Amino acid sequence: MATRPSSLVDSLEDEEDPQTLRRERSGSPRPRKIPRNALTQPVDQLLKDLRKNPSMISDPDQRTGREQLSNDELIKKLVTELAENSMIEAEEVRGTLGDISARIEAGFESLSALQVETIQTAQRCDHSDSIRILGENIKILDRSMKTMMETMKLMMEKVDLLYASTAVGTSAPMLPSHPAPPRIYPQLPSAPTADEWDIIP
């Protein structure tokens, strides 16, 4: 025969709250195994797959229905923000590339005009001292133009690398790697050297 509790308080203290029992979870959540093909497929395809099935990178077995729904919505929002940010950055890079190309072309035109003016000035000059000074200036200008051309080449290579790293995962067309066709990288006409002018140093 079961013994009765000494008081009603004792009987309540001995009972366990069923809500507490249901909330207890054993062990830590198991890590979700990402499919192997997700590591090799393109970024844009992976973003599309994540939009359709956010649970592919989470473990729904360890969550309630409401928790899993909240988790899926959060993943969808994050994926959408990543895609939008990537597209915005690609547009900014394309605009920057256009500005750089225009500035480089304008710089080359200015250098060409300066070279032509120098040559015309030398042709109109009859004094040997002035011709010698102009010849030295042409040599300096030629060295400066060569240095600037090398700098422009390095800049274009860096821009290509920046564009390639930013345009991954978007539909932006990739620029060709350096060297590129003349329509993108204008070619500066070669300047005559001092030997071709028969300038005596």
From Swiss-Prot:
Q: Which UniProt keywords apply?
A: Host cytoplasm, Host nucleus, Host-virus interaction, Inhibition of host innate immune response by virus, Inhibition of host RLR pathway by virus, Phosphoprotein, Viral immunoevasion
Q: Which Pfam family is an annotated match for this chain, by its short name? A: BDV_P24
Cellular localisation: Host nucleus; Host cytoplasm
Q: Does the keyword Manganese apply?
A: no
Instruction: Give the top-rank taxon of the lineage listed in the UniProt record for this protein.
Output: Viruses
Motif mapping: Nuclear localization signal 2: 181-193
Region (Disordered) residue ranges read 1-70
Q: Which GO terms describe its biological process?
A: symbiont-mediated suppression of host innate immune response
A cellular-component GO term for this protein: host cell nucleus
Indicate the principal place this protein occupies in or around the cell: host cell
Kindly state the positions of the motif Nuclear localization signal 1 in this protein.
29-36
Q: What does this protein do?
A: Essential component of the RNA polymerase transcription and replication complex. Acts as a scaffold which brings L in close proximity to the N-RNA complex. Plays a role in the segregation of the viral genome in host daughter cells during mitosis by interacting with host HMGB1, a host chromatin-remodeling DNA architectural protein, thereby stabilizing RNP on chromosomes. Interacts with host TBK1 and thus interferes with activation of cellular antiviral state. Inhibits cellular histone acetyltransferase activities.
Q: How is this protein named in the record?
A: Phosphoprotein
The scientific name of the source species is Borna disease virus 1 (BoDV-1)
Gene that this sequence comes from: P/X
